[in-house]
Amino acid sequence: LLKDLIPFIEKNYPVIGNRENRALAGLSMGGGQSLNFGLGNLDTFAWVGGFSSAPNTKMPAQLLPNPAEAKDKIKLLWISCGDEDRLLGISERTRDYMIEHKVPHIYFKEPGKHDFQVWKNDLYLFAQLLFVKK
């Protein structure tokens, strides 16, 4: 992602190649990896979303060991999950850590399970907030 995909995209497509114009989001296992990579590389990503993040998601203190830095760098941190999703606890523990450390984020719990109906809605809502100047 960092060494191959981003350089390829920046070389072959007309994109603005800086962190303020780069987002990362995913669902389920991809949601966990989006949080892991996005929050672990705040010099590369400013907009991060995890939808129904899976057990591969790092523990919150590992995800964000320096909350003060994150407060300055994150433009949007989106955490969402269905209220009947068996993985809800992963999103909740991440949300709780962000609240405890006063890291700005959006937590969205909605009716639903671990399925595409929930994720389509999450992506739609998340996308409305991307690259918006505050």
Language-model-derived ranges and their functions:
Residues 1-134:
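Non-catalytic cap/lid and distal C-terminal segments of serine-dependent acyl enzymes
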